[in-house]
């Protein structure tokens, strides 16, 4: 944890003496540091949680200080982000609306968790976030804050100030000489972490506009991807990825390595119109290369390691689990209960899946499972000594009895 202190004794009012701001250095939180200090007359502490933003964190301490923070915390939470948030979601194969790998949804609760620690340490009266009044993040942050520190005041500037658009926010920053990473010409809102990068706003709000190729940071276009396919094998132990091509990596290293490999082969791009929690539809463009590969490999390993009934029921729960994460309910009893069930299903999900990556496509080419339920002798169309074809007749008669009875009764009417 890095802390940068600046001498500051602001005049307090309204009972709020100190506020911890969830700080990223982006447009919204950059102007919020200044706005909170101006409008609440209190001490402002900036807290940035590192979940894999990379270069976005460079110079953040100095920037926070220049913008009005008395202290700035940068907390490295990358390992916890992977082990406590990403890995459980891989075990479930949770996709929101069958498309979204939940990159932002998973980052918000761990950011809130670390900010809550700083609020307690600083004995702050309030916590502040930069989520807009139209987005999902306001719900995710505030439900997490209420779960972790129910008695702390929450300040949401986008629901208080006169700034109505990103253009207004850019003007506010310009008047106060606050450096921000967007312009009116390219007002994209982006969110980056180990698991993905998301892009929203600007020209993307018109559904007829194709995204600009220059926007992408983690992946190349299919046209620029290698003409030769890339092969790799992902090994899992009890549902958790542990190695690539036999080489073991730490959780953060594994995700980072897969992002590089898959991104170079144009894996993991998605242009989605999704249903926001607050009721509207919105368009988001995402890069999730490691997520796409790990989900594909894990799902394939499960197909040979888990029995039919458990697998089918688990697939139903995956949809609900994705909603829980997306809707900001990570700290709910239901999510904890589902994790207990999911962990039980993963006891025998150990093995390796070989994949071929080619110009945006993920192709499964080989499977090995320590506890495989697949039997070549039983599945073969050639002669075998286990399966008696005559047994099928009795099974079909019993299985089809309700169908037969329904048809007979309807015919007699």
Curated annotation (Swiss-Prot):
It is found in: Cytoplasm. This is Argininosuccinate synthase. Homotetramer. It comes from the Bacteria. Its EC number is 6.3.4.5. ATP binds at residues 22-30, 130. Belongs to the argininosuccinate synthase family. Type 1 subfamily. Keywords: Amino-acid biosynthesis, Arginine biosynthesis, ATP-binding, Cytoplasm, Ligase, Nucleotide-binding. It catalyses: L-citrulline + L-aspartate + ATP = 2-(N(omega)-L-arginino)succinate + AMP + diphosphate + H(+). It holds the Pfam family Arginosuc_synth. GO terms for cellular component: cytoplasm. L-aspartate binds at residues 132, 136-137. The lineage of its organism: Bacteria, Pseudomonadati, Elusimicrobiota, Endomicrobiia, Endomicrobiales. It comes from Endomicrobium trichonymphae. L-citrulline binds at residues 100, 105, 136, 140, 189, 198, 274, 286. GO terms for molecular function: argininosuccinate synthase activity; ATP binding.
